Each structure stands twice: as structure tokens, then as C-alpha cells.
Amino acid sequence: MIRIINLRVAVTVKSDIKSIVEKKYPPLRGAIETIHVVRRAVDARKKPNIVFVYTLFIEVHNEAQVMKKLGKEKDVSVFAAEDPEPIVLGAKPLAHRPVVMGFGPAGMLAAFYLAREGYRPIVLERGQDVDTRSHDVETFWKKGIFKPESNVQFGEGGAGTFSDGKLTTRITHPRLHEISKYFVEFGAPEEILYKHKPHVGTDKLRTMVKAMRERIIEWGGEVRFGSKVTDLFIENDRIVGVEVNGSERIDTTVVLSGVGHSARDTYEMLYKRNVEMTAKPFAIGVRIEHDQAVIDESQYGVEPSSLGLGAAEYSLVYHDKESGRTAYSFCMCPGGQVVASASEEGGVVVNGMSLYARDSGVANSAIVVNVGPDDFGTHPLDGVAFQREWERKAYELGGSNFHAPAQTVGQFLGLSQAPSVQNSIYSYEPGVVNCDLHDCLPSFVTSVLERALPYWGRRIRGFDDPAVCMTGVETRTSAPLRMGRNEERISPTVGGFYPMGEGAGYAGGIMSAALDGAETAILCMAKYAKPN
């Protein structure tokens, strides 16, 4: 196989990729069997001359002869694709079916691989199926009626179901492409296999997770909604069963825990049951919203649809010399909306979401500042208490009815005659209240944001416009703790318990969580034979 990198093609060029390759590299004419687009990125650094930058895998006739004719082309090489390691099944007897806690990306992929290999997992998800859950979430947004077990955080697909559906990850692993191909099989757009910053969108994600659940069941797995694991049964420091909804017992010696970073009551239960965990850093801040046209103009210099481009994205970082902290944009959602994401009564949490089309006309992103155990304490659950404190203050500022506190950039920076939120763009439902965001965030966070906003305004024109709306608070950027696990991914303190995914502190997004779930299941299967 031949690999071509850095193939630069103007976005205005309409020729097919095969013709472009053959024109640039004449020895390939007539020799190409297949072309696979591995990656396509947008380079808009020299506006208005915007280009796609491709990486390609190409299968050809007479590869050695073609490479000889190509000579020393620096961007062309012979490439041997690395396949995922084959799955090897273990021999240790498994008297009961394995249990998977949670049906987000980690739990879903763990269950998928277990079911594919005949292990018939039992999935216990505290929330509801995606259709019921979507109705409950819409009711919460429109009417403020909150359901603590069916919301943006809990239910089929996990928190990622109500997000932009980003599939980006910094991890390189041969199984990632395999997982992406499964996602396409179940309804994700084929472009996720090659786009530099792939996304699915919350609308397509809902279809995809349902199809994956149906396949797990078809292969002998069981998926139970409204089923919260409320306790672990442990004998001689090993799992022997789980309690469901405070009453039912399911015997098992293997539990793969894919609970999310918002399952705080589950964290507390696991801590009481001696599952090893430590506090870890995360970040908190607010959501900021702009007219998408402002971001498009800054990033592309033109209206993106005229060039066949999607709504523009951004990624911003500010290193604060005064405090030593870092502020950064997080989970940027082009053409999306800010959503109410509470998972508990008495707290306001915001997040961002986009449909696949990203066509709302409004860009939003979290802008957050790093915090750590030095700020909130070293007890494993201190980060949870810290999050709750600021979520509660935001809830009270908003009127104790899940309306969110919001403030314009001008007000936040203390500018005279700054416009109010009522005259700005905001999308949070059930509503916002113009408040001082300094009252629902620690001063060491707000002071960094005050310095970061003008800095970012010099990089994206209009970013710090006084009329831009910010909504609080964003606290669930990542898990506030990490559960211990050994080289087999088993808890060192509770045998048979496998922490995995974002809630356990081992992932930071859909793809990394999915991969962690898959690889954890594969290691589990390498130890155990199929259950009777």
C-alpha cells in the first residue's frame, strides 16, 4: 500500500480525488486500484486561499515498479497498515454473566465486544432508553421539569448523546478505525472515517446508539434501563454480585464499570466499598456564545457554504502568567446551542450541543480554567463537593428553577454602559437571568477569564465584544477523580471490578471512552472463558 501525505487541494477544485492524484503523480496513472481517504483537514491560514490537506492510502498494481518511477517524492511512501491485535479468549471459568455498569461510550463498546464474542453481558443503565430520554430532556428544557434519572447525563448513550458528537481524539490506536467503522455501520456519516475533526451530531448519535444496542441484544446481551447499581457485594475483597435499585441481587464475579463523570452517588457507593480512587484536576468556567458568522469570518474570511465548508470552529488557549493557570476553550459547538445539563436537584450545569448540520447560526464553547486538589482538597470526593458548591450557587442565582445565571462580556469585564443579556444572543432553556457570574465561580477562575477574554479578542475579532453572552456554570469538563486499576485494568482493591471510561478518569470524549471500554472488555475476555 502507498501512503501520500500533505496533498493540498484548493477547496474550489471540483475534480475527483483520483484525477487529482494522477495529475500530481503521473506514475500512478492507470495503476490505482483503490483510494482510501485517511484524513482530510482544512488549512485556512492563508485566507482566502483555503485548501483541503489530504492523507491517502492507495492500493496499486505493481507497487515496487510504481514506487521506483515515483523516485524520491518526500510525501509518498510504502505503508503497512497496522491491524488491531486479534482477540484471544481466556480459560478461567466464569460462573455468571459479566455485568456492565452504564451504557455510555465505554459501557456500550465494552458490551458490544463482549456480546460479539459470546459473553452475553448484562448491561445495567440507570437512565432511560434514548427515545424516552430525549422526551424527558426536551420537557426539562421547555418546562423546567427535571428527572434525576433521565437527563442529559444519564441514559442510553451517556452524556455524549446530547453533545456535538465529536469523535476527535489525540490517541492513536489500530482499534480506533475499527470502532469508527462500526459507528458508520450503525448510522454515523461515512466522513467520520477521514475528516480531521469528525463529528456525528446529537441527532445521528441517537440513531446510532439505538442500532448498537439492538445488535448487542441480537448477539445475546441484555440491556436494562432504569437499573441503577446501588451496591456491590464483596467477599474476600472480590466482587460476587451487584445490587440493583436497592433490592434486586445479580450474582457476578466480573463488573465492568463505565459509569459517567456525573454519577456522584455511585462514586460515593464505590468509595464506601473500598474501590481505590484519588482526586484529580479538571476545569470549570462558563459557556460563551457568538453569532456563527463572526467565527466564520474570522476563521475563513468568507461565508463557508459558498466553498462547501461547514460552520467554522476554533480552539483557544491562554496561559496566565499572573496565576500560573491555563484558560482554554472546551467542547466548541459550531452552529449549536447551550443546554441545561443538570443531573441533581438544586444545581445548574451548562454544556454545548449541535445537530449534525450545525446550522443554528450560533457558535458556543466552554471557556474554562484548570482547577485541582490544591484548590478543593485531596479526599477522593472533594472535587465532587467543589463542583456541587458552584452548581448550587448558580442554581440560586438563577432563581432556583433551573434558569441559569448569565452575563455579557462587557458586564463581566466591568465596562461602563455594557449591554445586558436581554440584548444578546443566548440559547439556554428554560431561560437565563442576568446575574454577576463572579458570584457563582471562584475568584481565581474569574480573574483568569477576565485576562483571557481580551487576549482571545485579539485572535478572533469580536470574541470579546461587550454584547456577547456568557452562561454559567460549566463544571463537568472531566471526571473529578480517577479510580485505580492494574495492568489487567482491574481495581487493586476489589477483584473482578474493572474501572473504565471517562467516569473512571481514563478518557476525555466519545472516542477515547469507547476505545477504553473496548480494550477493557478485550483484556477481561483474555482472562476468562465464556460464561456457562
Question: Which ranges hold each PLM region?
Answer:
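Residues forming the flavin
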Residues: 1-52, 56-162, 166-532
